[in-house]
């Protein structure tokens, strides 16, 4: 894309100065070499809530690492067009890290876990059901909306990917290092990150893992996060903070 010609690689330094901006999301099909379109909820927020008008500067991410500075050209009934002025490239340091999270009984605690992970940089989620999962039903669209909102709020530019798996055996077969958190082990969590490896961090549901589920994984892959019992969402946020 021609917009890459104006790319700024020092994304972190620029983002420090953009800490007060409002960030919008537009998918790749709405982005050309020179123009970005905003439609749907993003358009409504920009025009109805933020009162943006023709000539104003707005910032848009494409969800694949770019933050794009634009100037609004036209505003119509259900969409706006904006001219691309400059692009900022950001780095996905968690590209090879997968957070495997059980469905939690309390929707607000589940929402909290997703939000905080995204704010701290996680971009890959696997939501799974275990034998002791209490929560019923699946709402991937809601989870994706939560992740999208957290991405924009924290000025991140990688749209999180969320995948649903029915059991732990599917995760155990994934290609990468598995790290399982279980309260009843003595081995304390230690982590050395290698950029060329994939890591799967696996968290238990409210009732913990069963013995049969833990047999899917090597004993050396099981760690404790704390001397005290943590709620599932607390363990999730603590782990990503440590990483």
Regions found by a protein language model. Name each.
Residues 26, 202-205, 224-226:
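Thr-Gly-centered strand-to-loop micro-motif
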Residues 4-89, 141:
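N-terminal positively charged helical leader segments and presequences
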Residues 199-211:
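A C-terminal functional module that forms or caps the active site or interfaces directly
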Residues 182-196:
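Strongly charged, low-complexity linkers/loops
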Residues 91-177:
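RNA substrate-binding interface of SAM-dependent RNA methyltransferases
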Residues 211-243:
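Structured adenosyl-cofactor binding patch, chiefly the S-adenosyl-L-methionine
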Residues 162, 178-180, 219-224:
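Conserved beta-strand scaffold positions in the cores of enzyme catalytic domains, especially
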């Amino acid at each position: 894309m021609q917009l890459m010609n104006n790319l700024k690689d020092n994304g972190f330094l620029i983002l420090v100065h953009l800490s007060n901006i409002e960030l919008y999301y537009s998918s790749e099909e709405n982005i050309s070499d020179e123009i970005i379109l905003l439609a749907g909820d993003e358009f409504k927020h920009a025009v109805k809530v933020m009162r943006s008008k023709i000539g104003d500067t707005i910032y848009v991410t494409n969800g694949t690492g770019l933050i794009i500075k634009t100037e609004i050209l036209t505003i119509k009934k259900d969409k706006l067009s904006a001219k691309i002025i400059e692009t900022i490239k950001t780095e996905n340091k968690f590209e090879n890290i997968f957070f495997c999270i059980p469905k939690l009984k309390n929707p607000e605690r589940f929402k909290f876990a997703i939000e905080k992970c995204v704010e701290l940089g996680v971009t890959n989620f696997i939501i799974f059901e275990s034998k002791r999962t209490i929560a019923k039903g699946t709402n991937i669209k809601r989870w994706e909306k939560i992740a999208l909102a957290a991405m924009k709020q924290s000025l991140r530019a990688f749209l999180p990917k969320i995948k649903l798996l029915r059991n732990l055996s599917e995760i155990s077969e994934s290609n990468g290092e598995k790290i399982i958190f279980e309260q009843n082990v003595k081995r304390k969590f230690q982590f050395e990150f290698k950029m060329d490896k994939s890591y799967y961090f696996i968290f238990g549901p409210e009732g913990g893992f069963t013995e049969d589920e833990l047999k899917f994984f090597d004993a050396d892959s099981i760690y404790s996060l704390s001397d005290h019992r943590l709620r599932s969402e607390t363990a999730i946020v603590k782990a990503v903070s440590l990483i």
